[in-house]
Structures are given as structure tokens and as C-alpha cells.
Amino acid sequence: MNTVDWTPETLVADIEDLVTLPEVALRIASMVDDPTSSAAAIGREICNDAALTARLLRVANSPAFGQDGKIATVSRAITVLGVRQVRDLTVGITAIRTFDGIANELVTMESFWRQSVLCALAAGHIAARRQGGRNESPFVAGLLHDIGQLVLFNRAPELARQALLMSIYAADEPGLYRCEREVMGFDHGIVGVRLAQKWGLPRVLQECIQFHHEPSEAKEYPIEVATIHMADTVAVLAEIGSTDLRDGPAISPMALRALKLDHATLAEIVLQTQESAEGMLPLLTGAPMAVPALAAVQVL
């Protein structure tokens, strides 16, 4: 296909055979939405996939969920975390597995998922401190927020590279999503939400994926989208080892107002994110996770 013919819909349709969400995740998502399905039946469905079960239990027992080895079975995970949280973790884990075999020339899967995991952890910490909103799967929303980038990297690598280089070298630092719009007419958020819709992901995840760069555009879940928007900046700071907010992407004033978190609290969340990051990526992907040590806390 000629590059000028790409649209978010054709990109997702073109890659669908390569990144179809595994049947186990689709079945579990359907069962969670079915009022006649029991927690026990959902647990049995998960247990049919031994690799998924093992990874789910490792993640559920991680510091990110505060269980400290207390969850020994899938049924216990459902009881403690709830069926929707377990469903969303299942989607996140299987999505990582799905994309692991997808080639691209612009970024390694390890670096992509490392940044995504940092965003997921930051989102959880922000959700625990913010005022308002529902605790709608902040971890998984953070994990999947940039999934549209992987579609672009794989299906339209030349256009994605052009946008990436523009974002790096532009004097006014416009941000990758704006450069994607200039090059392609759309950004990775809309590509990601088209994939999320194909997968039947919950509406809250769709909004977080689509609007995480522009939280003021969120319709149904503005607090949750603002959380992922802010977590994106916290993840960058955790990655580079800084608590100075000037070192990361600017946080929307709307998000700061909506979440009611000051700069000192955000600096603490950067530290929390770093502390909880080590060991999380291996749980999800098997790859090691290393983040730089932070210098002295520097708060605006």
C-alpha cells in the first residue's frame, strides 16, 4: 500500500492478523461482561493457559498491587483484585506476548515496554493519591497507552521514522503526536484506539489510549485520562533519573487541576515509580528492568 493511503483503520486492518488478541483474553473479557459468568468460571478459563496463569500470579504479587506473595491462586487473585482488574491484567499480559514477535526497526520491544511499565506504575501511584475518578485499571491503561506506536512502527515505519526525527530535532519541541499529525494526518492515539476497539477493550482504556496527550478532549473518563497523561511525564522522569518536572513533557494545566497534585507530590511519585519498577518488567516480559538512580530531589 502506498504510504499516502494509510488511515488509522487501514493500518489496524492490515496488522490485525499479526496482532489479534489471543482467544483466552477475548473469552475472559466476554465472560466478565456476562452477568451469568461466575468468578470461578473465569478463573478456570485463565488456568487453561499455564503461561498466562504463572505471569498473572507473579504480577498480582508484585509491589505494584501490594500483595507481597499473598496470592497463590487465580481464584484468590480474582477475590482480592476483582474480576475487572484481573481481566485487564490478562489483556495487558497477552498484549505484550502478542507484540513480542512483531518486527520493527525503530525501537526495541524491551525499551518500549520498559517505558510503558514505568507509565503503568506511575499511573497506579497517581490514582492512589488523586482526588476523584474511579479506580479503573490505571496500571493496564498505562501499560497500553502507546500501543498505537507499535502499529505505526510495524506497518508505516518510514512515516513513523519521519515523525520521530521531526520530534527530536524540531526547535520548538512539538511532541511526537503533533509531528505524527503533520506527517500522516493522525497520531498514534487514534491508531491505538482503533486497535483497542477491534479488541473490544473497555471504554476507559480506549479513552486513555486515544487522549493521553490531550486529556481535555476526554469525554467519559477525564480523570482517568488525566492520570495517564500525568503518568506519561512521570515515566519519562523516572527513566532519566530526575524529579525536576522541567525535564519531562509538560503536564496539561487541566490535568494538574483535575488531579489536584502539586509538584512536591509528583516528585514523590517519581521516586515511588522508580522504587517499584525494578523487577516488574521481568514479571511481564522476562526482560530485565533497570532504571537510573535518582539524584537529589529537585522540585519546582
Question: What are these language model-derived features?
Answer:
Residues 1-10, 253-300:
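Terminal helices and disordered tails flanking the catalytic cores of nucleotide-processing hydrolases
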Residues 1-164, 168, 172-253, 293-294:
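Conserved alpha-helical "signature site"
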